[in-house]
């Protein structure tokens, strides 16, 4: 009993020495700490977003094998963009890159972009090819991407000027060759007959896959082509050298290639928004606006959802690899802590000008963060 009384006296003495406790003050201190923590988290996320955007710019140039962003003005883009059905279809299908992360898979992408469609505009050849004393259209230089992929389709697109009366048009595509003994300078590729009605001009496509494959096998045989589209009166309706008001009506080649799909594996993670108070590793939304960055050379998409990872990775949280937690338990001082990083990324499709003013439609791997985790 005496021991109990002694303990009570000691406890009361300690309370008196410590002085009165202000519960409101403790509550305010706790609230300030919480606010400071949230503020620090917001600042950290903002810095992470800025770093992510800069990293995306570097990755795009690297994956497209570009040392610098192509310097193409908006006026030049208006002149170079073909006003043709295949390009319009590619542009029309673009919205902000859709967020499709529900499958929970992790794509094993290669680093560099994989090309799906290449639109090649005519250019000047290394030599001046002339027939009957006049330069002939057209000569096409091909990207190295075409040579190392399987060509599944190659279309030559030509624009035919409008006619005033109904007429039949005879279209002829000729391949220029080295002069033969009999003086022949070209050989036929395709011929077709079209019926045109008065009104607007039309785009016509011609299959040139076989010719393209031959050119890729024997590049020295690529001397260019000649395009003719004669009406019943002998007038050439094909736009080969665009005149005033004919910007975007140049002939061009549309080449499609294919790539082998890759396997995937399963993974999961947390999703948050900018107002989230989640402290753990989480995926946050981030939209990259190429127009705001001044990258007019990217035709589409003008913006896409890139997302980013941010948050803490304590060892009590689920690790990407089971051995990570085991190693830390065995040697907690010798192992570095895990980082919040993407565990699932997906590609984006992009339509853009390369450094040679060719229009490329390709797939760039690992540009969208779909899942985040600690590893």
From Swiss-Prot:
The UniProt function text for this chain reads:
Acts specifically as a negative regulator of skeletal muscle growth.
**UniProt-listed CDD domains:** TGF_beta_GDF8
Propeptide cleavage-removed residue intervals: 24-266
Give glycosylation sites per the record. Answer: 71
* Record's signal peptide: 1-23
Give the family this protein belongs to, as stated in its UniProt record: Belongs to the TGF-beta family.
The protein's matches in SUPFAM superfamilies, at most eight in alphabetical order, are given as: Cystine-knot cytokines
Gene Ontology MF term list: cytokine activity; growth factor activity; heparin binding; identical protein binding
PTM per UniProt?
Synthesized as large precursor molecule that undergoes proteolytic cleavage to generate an N-terminal propeptide and a disulfide linked C-terminal dimer, which is the biologically active molecule. The circulating form consists of a latent complex of the C-terminal dimer and other proteins, including its propeptide, which maintain the C-terminal dimer in a latent, inactive state. Ligand activation requires additional cleavage of the prodomain by a tolloid-like metalloproteinase.
Q: Which biological processes are named by the entry's GO terms?
A: myoblast migration involved in skeletal muscle regeneration; negative regulation of myoblast proliferation; negative regulation of satellite cell differentiation; negative regulation of skeletal muscle satellite cell proliferation; positive regulation of lamellipodium assembly; positive regulation of macrophage chemotaxis
Signal in keyword set:
yes
Disulfide bridge partners, by residue number: 272-282, 281-340, 309-372, 313-374
Give me the segments passing through the membrane: none
Site described as Cleavage, located at 98-99
Protein name as annotated = Growth/differentiation factor 8
Listed A to Z, the keywords are: Cleavage on pair of basic residues, Cytokine, Disulfide bond, Glycoprotein, Growth factor, Heparin-binding, Secreted, Signal
Q: Where in the cell is it found?
A: Secreted
Q: Name one GO cellular component term.
A: extracellular space
* Record's subunit section: Homodimer; disulfide-linked. Interacts with WFIKKN2, leading to inhibit its activity. Interacts with FSTL3.
Principal cellular location given in the protein's record = secreted
């Amino acid at each position: 009993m005496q021991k109990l009384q002694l303990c009570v006296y000691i406890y009361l003495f300690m309370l008196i020495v410590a002085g009165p406790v202000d519960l409101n003050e403790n509550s305010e201190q706790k609230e300030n700490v919480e606010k400071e923590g949230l503020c620090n988290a917001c600042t950290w996320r903002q810095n992470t977003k800025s770093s992510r955007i800069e990293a995306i710019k570097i990755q795009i140039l690297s994956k497209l094998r570009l040392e610098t962003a192509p310097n193409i003005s908006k006026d030049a883009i208006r002149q170079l963009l073909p006003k043709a059905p295949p390009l319009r279809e590619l542009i029309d299908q673009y919205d902000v890159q859709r967020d499709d992360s529900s499958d929970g898979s992790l794509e094993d992408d290669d680093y560099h972009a994989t090309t799906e469609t290449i639109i090649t505009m005519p250019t000047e050849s290394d030599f001046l090819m002339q027939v009957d004393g006049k330069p002939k259209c057209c000569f096409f230089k091909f990207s190295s991407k075409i040579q190392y992929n399987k060509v599944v389709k190659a279309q030559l697109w030509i624009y035919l000027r409008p006619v005033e009366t109904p007429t039949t048009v005879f279209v002829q595509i000729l391949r220029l060759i080295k002069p033969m003994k009999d003086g022949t300078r070209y050989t036929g590729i395709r011929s077709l007959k079209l019926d045109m009605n008065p009104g607007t001009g039309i785009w016509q496509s011609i299959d040139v896959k076989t010719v393209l494959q031959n050119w890729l096998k024997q590049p020295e045989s690529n001397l260019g082509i000649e395009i003719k589209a004669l009406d019943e009166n002998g007038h050439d309706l094909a736009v080969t050298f665009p005149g005033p008001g004919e910007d975007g009506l140049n002939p061009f080649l549309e080449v499609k290639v294919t790539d082998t799909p890759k396997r995937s594996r399963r993974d999961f993670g947390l999703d948050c928004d900018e107002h989230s108070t989640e402290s753990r590793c989480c995926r946050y939304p981030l939209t990259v606006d190429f127009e705001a960055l001044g990258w007019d050379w990217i035709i589409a998409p003008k913006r896409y959802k890139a997302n980013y990872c941010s948050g803490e990775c304590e060892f009590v949280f689920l690790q990407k690899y089971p051995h990570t937690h085991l190693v830390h338990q065995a040697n907690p001082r010798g192992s570095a802590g895990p980082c919040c990083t993407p565990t699932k990324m997906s590609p984006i499709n992009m339509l853009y000008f390369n450094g040679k003013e060719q229009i490329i439609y390709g797939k760039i791997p690992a540009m969208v963060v779909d899942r985040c985790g600690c590893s």
